[in-house]
From Swiss-Prot, chain B:
GO terms for cellular component: Atg12-Atg5-Atg16 complex; autophagosome; axoneme; phagophore; phagophore assembly site membrane. Belongs to the ATG5 family. InterPro entries: Atg5 (IPR007239), ATG5_HBR (IPR048940), Atg5_HR (IPR042526), ATG5_UblA (IPR048939), Atg5_UblA_dom_sf (IPR042527), ATG5_UblB (IPR048318). It comes from Bos taurus (Bovine). This is Autophagy protein 5. Its main location: cytoplasm. Conjugated to ATG12; which is essential for autophagy, but is not required for association with isolation membrane. GO terms for biological process: aggrephagy; apoptotic process; autophagosome assembly; autophagy; cellular response to nitrogen starvation; immune system process; mitophagy; piecemeal microautophagy of the nucleus. The modification N-acetylmethionine is found at residue 1.
Length: 1185, 275
């Protein structure tokens, strides 16, 4: 098989952009095949000076500063002057919104965007800035028919499709007729031909052949191929990110314009198809309700407004994250939308809810997932009891304390409000799933950036009060400064929370509110006499008009810094940034470290021969645990344990763990030398707090010593103590070395092993099962490391994390944990159960199965009964954070109610019911969350699926260079990280690398060879990646092994290994510096779950079905043996720790064993890749220039 | 990167090389050889000198032996002060090893407390720990501990077992997440130049405006004479565990990391050596 240059070859009259400046010749790099290179599609261009530039990407190269991306979680608010501000959950200052030109009345935020109504009554959407662009593929098909005269030509039969059409052929689609949907989009490149046909490269020109339209197309032209077609693609990109983009209104020119007056976004939990779908609802001044169609991540503006009939005149609307939609009517009642579901996000009908009291109608409502809050016309705040999906109207109103202008329910049903008198922003404290109404209102006193300058020009209490007051409450006859002062002193915005204030003071003294018209001419305000202005801006606080928490995630473990003003940073306050930790670098700390070292030297160096005053003693800790006995029938039995610790004079510690048990009334014991223990693994299953203890022998048996404690604290104490003793006896302290081997178990626990120098030695290798693994706090699915100490992880919820250099956390407290650098970490995953039904002729599908059938509520295999009530979170560390919901995203698709059909259990399921289907099932999912601690910090902005950091051989590269890091986003975008270094392991920003389909895996080798795997199972090689050109040049398509779909790739120094979906491990044959794509795949092994190739081309895998003397294990760490320069595929496997391991990274381990004399300098032979273990590196690696 | 945890280890394993010589007037049967020992800085003299006692008793007549006491350059050494404090305060400028004179006669009743058994040291140590926790947590942490935890603290010190001691002691070093530190910092400031044994006052780790107090703040407040004026010459050394932390060091951090096992910061103020 030969790699085909994945490129455009221009055939026919195709408009083509002048490409001279961007066609970086592949030949220059001596690695391209003979085909002419296609112009690099997309955004890359060279400027006039020949420098390479990336267009439209936020990151500069070299990066100068971190881009100020929209905070991932922020509260949005509008002040009385229409200025929009955001307050990050991590910050304590309001940031003004970018587009300062526009003034807004209303905003409604979601996670990634914010919709608003500006003072011009137009609707705008602001899509948050992201390193990953929003890009959409447009496609068109060119169809041709063969005729005996001219061969294939555009002349089709009259009955045929259009010569240029969509995929179905029904729609005419000429290339120049495909237009951009709005001004906010731009084309990324010109049209080009897609030469990838289902993972296989096509012949020249991308043509696929068939007997007739419409039919099955093949790559090969046959004698009966009468028609052919090819696919043209072109990308458009949303260019108005981080700016307010105007949404055109649907005014009928026949009628008077009806401007929008309120708007609300939500509904993202109704369905995630398409990705990022949102419900956007709006209300006009005439009281009509509109719904914005087709708003999603890839179509942030939506397509059109459609009118939704209402039984009354609407004034305000609120759409919750799920299926709640409430509208307030002019008359004071509320309308509740019924029938909103994933198939009908607009809902079907309205029902009416009466206000709490007949004299005061509802002024404002706000909905969450299962709460509704309202404000009535007398400014009282109400909580609606009993609201949920099944009963969107709820049951009754409860009056809450405080008086508010408005309230807003955000993520997790958290609530914010704007105080009625002081116009301050309040956060409802204590809102939890069990106590949705919360406890108290707490005022947010976060400062605003540049408060001083803002107030200098136009900030005036008098004007603000007059200007936006909705009702006449007092007379405006006395508006002197003294009066305004009084009205502010009494409520005391920062001193006492609203909830504590009496009603009398809420009404306020002679508060200067007049009924000014709602005009927005702010310039007039500036004409007010200077005397009215607040003299000291530090004392005045912002006056708010609107707040939206739809993008603001406040959870139990979030610590908010909104409620105190802090001047100056405390030196010991841990700042959440890795690159700058002032506390770490403080001079006083350095001095203490240094002086202690000097003191020890001074007082001990010359006196080592002195006797110690305190004789070392044996220390024994005893306790009662349970032990999973070694013999059948296996069961938990009560045992006494004793840990004996002996410390020698040199400080070396030796410990023995004794386990005393009684069998047949005979007292027996087993013992374990802790210096032989290779791993201590917590096992939180079966509602028992237990852990497994491995030794080399136990590893070979696949049968660890399992011990359980009565309480979590007890288990944590024992685990910490045993871990400390193990580390002590191996003299291991502090953080892992940069060269460490990192791994993750299927439970998300993180383990790290120090590579000994003889780990990869040519002779007397350290057997894999003798490696010592110690646990590091945190919870991850993927961990990848680099020998310069940069370590990244990805959680189950795709959150990216960067290692902080600490250790401990999780259940390791006290001495086993570093003081700084340990932070809160969390992860989210879903538990799935299946509802099974069988058809019978009388009642149709019911939950009454045959006696031989599986459980009607079961796991995926059907063997275990799993009901909604009995199914527990995966372990005691996890807690439920949602209710059960139907999972529609199962492979194979479902019908509208989530069912999948089959002829019988167990069988292959399909999404439509046919005559032969007698059973059906559907998948229910429930979200659970774990909160722990560990030496990890979140890398915000983009969720990841895979990550790869360049492995480096020591001294092979200048250590001053940035560290190349590539990743795949959860949506399949290929990204490379800019600015990653030892000092800034988090890097600065992402650079997006365009692809024609979503990718799943990526790996970068020591010489910047980037390989990736696409969703269709084929591999891609990225050419010309280098430090000066971090994102490379273009993709080369590399077909997968025959009839296999690849799922992972790993590139070491010269070796490329890939893994397919059936667990086969493949080696790429024929990779050379001049031909980096190689020739063919060679099979190496089966039963492999994950592969990691290191900087010395060492090959480590996680393997399944490893036979031990006691049991068979899945997920075992294995090293490939016999890997030599002439035999890079190796010979066999050396089995290490397992099972239950899921992921491993050997890519930091670049320590070569000292070269033995018997080792032949193999690399000298005819330009072969250099030797792997111990050989001299005289020839440069492939692709290295 | 060095971690703060390493400081605890360094502090715990601090040793002072010491040479014990018998007082010349003591009556011996034969000549008493000096005895050399590495004394743990964090421990107490009478707790770690069993070997010394045995060594000198061998050369003495039984009837001449009464309670042992120690003296350095004429100053009787208080056993109830940690060893490191005694050394810093009295001998830090002299050459190593530290020459201590051993006495068995004429117990200086007005200078020293009697130490008839280890139980007395334990009682003294535990009362210090309790006093410190009263200052730090209104005694809440120490009172919630079980008897065996108290015992483990003491046994950890007595047997020089860092792990055993800190497994419990870490609980005494915690503070609520919403606070910026302890309620009050347990500290004692010693000066050789004054008659007063030590200074101890209530001092919070954080100022009213949220700033962390530093060692300098503490000294300015409770012992202004120790701090050199802005432009003046440095007259004193401020020493803890044989080192001179910068005056900018946050007091809370010092309390967590440089406290003695009795949970007090013992700060010595000694005249700057002239050479």
């Amino acid at each position: 098989m030969k790699a085909i240059l994945y490129s455009q070859r221009n055939e026919g009259p195709v408009p083509r952009r002048p490409t001279g400046l961007c066609a970086v010749s592949v030949a220059e790099h001596r690695c391209g095949p003979a085909h002419p290179p296609r112009s690099r599609r997309g955004k890359e261009r060279r400027n006039s000076s020949g420098e390479w530039q990336e267009e439209g990407v936020r990151g500069r190269w070299p990066p100068k500063a971190a881009p100020a991306a929209m905070p991932s979680s922020a509260l949005w608010a509008v002040d009385l002057f229409g200025r929009v501000f955001t307050l990050s959950t991590a910050g304590q200052h309001w940031e003004p919104c970018r587009d300062a030109q526009l003034e807004f009345k209303r905003v409604s935020a979601a996670r990634d965007c914010c919709w608003g109504i500006a003072c011009d009554h137009q609707v705008y959407v602001l899509v948050g800035a992201s390193d990953v662009p929003i890009r959409c593929q447009e496609e068109a098909y060119e169809n041709q028919r063969w005729n005996p005269v001219g061969g294939f030509c555009e002349t089709l039969l009259p009955s045929d499709r259009w010569p240029w059409s969509d995929v179905s052929g029904l729609q005419h689609r000429p290339l120049d007729g495909v237009a951009l949907p709005s001004l906010h989009w731009e084309w990324e490149s010109d049209w080009y031909v897609d030469e990838n046909f289902g993972g296989e490269p096509t012949e020249k020109g991308g043509w696929t052949y068939a007997i007739d339209f419409p039919a099955a197309y093949t790559r090969d032209k046959k004698w009966n191929s009468c028609v052919r077609r090819r696919r043209w693609i072109r990308y458009r990109r949303y260019k108005s990110q981080d700016a307010w983009a105007k949404i055109p209104s649907e005014d009928d020119p026949q009628q008077l314009p009806d401007p929008f007056s309120d708007l609300s976004v939500g509904g993202w939990e109704v369905t995630d198809e398409p990705v990022g779908r949102l419900s956007v609802w709006a209300v006009t001044l005439q009281g009509k309700v509109w719904y914005r169609e087709n708003v999603s991540h890839h179509n942030p503006e939506g397509s059109s407004w459609s009118l939704v009939d209402t039984p009354g005149e609407a004034v305000q609307i609120s759409c919750g994250p799920h299926d709640l939609l409430w509208v307030t009517l002019w008359e004071g009642q509320a309308l509740v939308r019924e029938g909103i579901n994933r198939n009908n996000p607009k809902g079907s009908s309205w029902s009416t809810v009466e206000p709490p009291t007949s004299e005061n109608g509802i002024l404002h409502v706000s909905t969450g997932v299962c709460v509704v809050w309202a404000v009535t016309k007398d400014r009282k705040v109400w909580f609606r009891r009993g609201v949920n999906s099944h009963n969107p109207c709820g049951t009754s109103w409860i009056e809450m304390f405080g008086e508010m202008m408005m309230v807003n329910v955000g993520l997790n049903d958290q609530v914010w409000g704007i105080g009625c008198v002081d116009r301050a922003l309040y956060f409802r404290q204590g809102v939890t799933q069990s106590e949705l109404s919360g406890k108290t209102w707490k005022v947010i006193v976060a400062g605003r950036e540049g408060d001083r300058s803002l107030s200098g020009s136009s900030f005036s209490l008098h004007s603000a009060g007059c200007f936006f007051g909705n009702e006449v409450r007092g007379s405006a006859e006395s508006c002197g400064p003294g009066d305004t002062d009084a009205s502010w002193e009494v409520p005391g915005p920062a001193s006492s929370p609203a909830g504590l204030r009496g009603k009398e003071s809420w009404k306020g003294p002679s508060h200067a509110t007049a009924n000014f018209p709602e005009a927005t001419d702010l310039s007039s305000l500036r004409l007010l006499p200077l005397g009215l202005e607040e003299p000291d801006s530090a004392d005045c606080h912002a006056l708010w008009a609107w707040v939206s928490g739809g993008g603001c995630a406040v959870e139990a473990h979030t610590t908010l810094k909104w409620f105190t003003t802090q001047s100056g940073l405390c030196p010991s306050v841990q700042t959440l940034s890795l690159s700058i930790t002032p506390a770490q670098t403080a001079a006083w700390r350095k001095q203490i470290f240094q002086q202690l070292t000097e003191r020890t030297k001074r007082e001990l160096e010359n006196f080592q021969h002195y006797e110690q005053a305190v004789e070392q003693s044996v220390w024994v800790k005893t306790g009662a645990l349970q032990w999973w006995c070694d013999w059948k029938p296996h069961k938990w039995m009560d045992v006494h344990v004793a840990l004996e610790q002996l410390t020698g004079h040199d400080g070396a510690q030796d410990s023995i763990l004794f386990i005393y048990y009684v069998v047949h009334e005979e007292k027996k014991y087993i013992h374990v030398f802790l210096n032989e223990v290779t791993a201590l693994v917590p096992v939180f299953s079966e509602a028992k707090h237990s852990f497994a203890l491995y030794t080399p022998e136990r590893t070979r048996q696949r049968w660890p010593v399992r011990l359980a404690a009565a309480t979590e604290q007890d288990m944590s104490d024992w685990l910490t103590l045993l871990n400390l003793s193990c580390c002590e006896s191996r003299r291991m302290h502090g953080r892992p070395s940069p060269q460490a081997i990192w791994s993750v178990t299927c439970k998300g626990d993180i383990f790290v092993s120090e590579p000994s120098p003889d780990l990869e030695g040519p002779e007397r290798r350290l057997p894999c099962d003798q490696m010592f693994w110690r646990q590091i706090g945190g919870h991850l699915r993927v961990v990848e490391a680099n020998s310069r100490g940069v370590v990244w992880g990805i959680g189950y919820d795709h959150t990216a994390w960067v290692y902080t250099g600490g250790y401990g956390g999780g259940c390791f407290q006290g001495l086993a944990s570093s003081t700084s650098n340990v932070f809160t970490q969390w992860d989210v995953k879903f538990v799935h159960i299946y509802e099974n039904q069988r058809w019978n002729p009388v009642t149709g599908y019911t939950s009454r199965g045959l006696p031989t059938d599986r459980y009607m509520w079961s796991d995926a295999t059907g063997l275990q009964e799993c009901t909604k009530a009995s199914t527990k979170p995966p372990s005691l560390q996890w807690t439920w954070v949602s209710d059960w919901f139907v999972d529609f995203s199962v492979p194979g698709g479902t019908d509208p109610e989530g069912w999948q059909y089959a002829s019988d259990f167990p069988a292959s399921y399909h999404k439509y019911k046919t005559m032969k289907d007698f059973v059906r099932r559907r998948c229910w999912a429930r979200k659970c969350k774990l909160v722990t601690t560990g030496p990890w910090l979140e890398v915000t902005s983009v969720a990841l699926r895979d990550v790869s950091i360049i492995p480096e051989s020591p001294g092979a590269h200048g250590s001053g260079l940035n560290i190349a890091l590539w990743a795949i986003s959860d949506k399949g975008d290929v990204l490379c990280r800019l600015g990653v270094s030892e000092l800034n392991p988090e890097g600065f920003c992402w650079m997006h690398v365009g692809t024609d389909q979503p990718f799943t895996s990526v790996s970068i080798g020591t010489c910047y060879q980037v390989w990736a795997v696409a969703r269709d199972g084929s591999a891609f090689y990225r050419s010309s990646v280098s430090p000066s050109r971090p994102n490379g040049d273009c993709w080369y398509h590399i077909p997968p092994p025959p009839k296999q779909r690849l799922k992972q790739v790993s590139v070491g120094h010269t070796s490329v290994f890939a893994l397919d979906e059936n667990g086969n491990l493949w080696y790429r044959q024929g990779v050379t510096p001049s031909h980096p794509q190689g020739d063919s795949w060679e099979h190496v092994s089966n039963n492999v779950r994950h592969v990691s190739v290191g900087p010395l081309d060492q090959v480590w895998v996680i393997a399944d079905k490893v036979q031990g003397s006691h049991s068979l294990s899945r997920g075992t760490v294995c090293r490939r043996t016999g890997v030599q320069s002439l035999e890079p595929k190796g010979q066999g496997w050396d089995y290490g720790i397992g099972g239950g391991w899921d992921h491993l990274s050997i890519r930091a381990s670049a320590t070569r064993a000292p070269r033995s004399s018997s080792q032949k300098p193999a690399s000298k032979q005819n330009g072969q890749p250099p030797s792997v273990a111990g050989g001299p590196w005289q020839t440069p690696g492939p692709v290295c220039c | 990167m060095t971690d703060d945890k390493d400081v605890l280890r360094d502090v715990w394993f601090g040793r002072i090389p010491t040479c014990f010589t018998l007082y010349q007037d003591e009556i011996t049967e034969r000549e008493a050889e000096p005895y050399y020992l590495l004394l743990p800085r964090v421990s107490y003299l009478t707790l770690v000198t069993d070997k010394v006692k045995k060594h000198f008793q061998k050369v003495m007549r039984q009837e001449d032996i009464s309670e042992i006491w120690f003296e350095y350059e004429g100053t009787p050494l208080k056993w109830h002060y940690p060893i490191g404090l005694l050394f810093d305060l009295l001998a830090s400028s002299s050459a190593l090893p530290w020459n201590i004179t051993v006495h068995f006669k004429s117990f200086p009743e007005k200078d020293l407390l009697h130490c008839p058994s280890k139980d007395v040291i334990e009682a003294h140590f535990m009362s210090c720990v309790k006093e410190a926790d009263a200052l730090k947590h209104k005694s809440q942490v120490i009172n919630e501990m079980q008897k065996k935890d108290h015992k483990q603290l003491w046994m950890g010190l007595q047997n020089d077992r860092f792990d055993q001691f800190w497994a419990i002691n870490r609980k005494l070093m915690e503070y609520p997440a919403e606070e910026n530190g302890f309620r009050y910092i347990p500290f004692r400031i010693y000066q050789t130049t004054t008659e007063r044994p030590f200074i101890q006052k209530l001092f919070r780790p954080v100022s009213t405006d949220g700033q962390l107090h530093t060692l300098g703040d503490l000294l300015k407040e409770v012992c202004p004479s120790a701090v050199a004026p802005e432009d003046g010459e440095k007259k004193n050394q401020v020493m803890i565990h044989g080192i001179e932390p910068m005056l900018e060091t946050p007091l809370q951090w010092l309390s967590e990391h440089l406290s003695y096992p009795d949970n007090f910061l013992h700060i010595s103020i000694i005249p700057q050596p002239t050479d």
